[in-house]
Amino acid sequence: GRPSARYDAPYCSQEEVRECQDDCSGNAVRDSCLCAYDPAGSPACECRCVEPWRR
């Protein structure tokens, strides 16, 4: 499968990923963090909480 976004998205700063992980760690269900870069949208890193198996 595709490597996790944390490694293959050079646009996501370590700080952003860490912040997202902090946010998600308190989430009972979606406690994994998925950071993705959307080339079609703004050049921003988008992080969201996901279920661990959906990473």
From Swiss-Prot:
Main localization (coarse): secreted
UniProtKB keywords: Disulfide bond, Ion channel impairing toxin, Neurotoxin, Secreted, Toxin
GO molecular function: ion channel regulator activity; toxin activity
Location in the cell: Secreted
A Gene Ontology term for the protein's cellular component: extracellular region
Expressing tissues: Expressed by the venom duct.
Full protein name: Conotoxin Cal22d
Protein source organism: Californiconus californicus
Organism lineage: Eukaryota, Metazoa, Spiralia, Lophotrochozoa, Mollusca
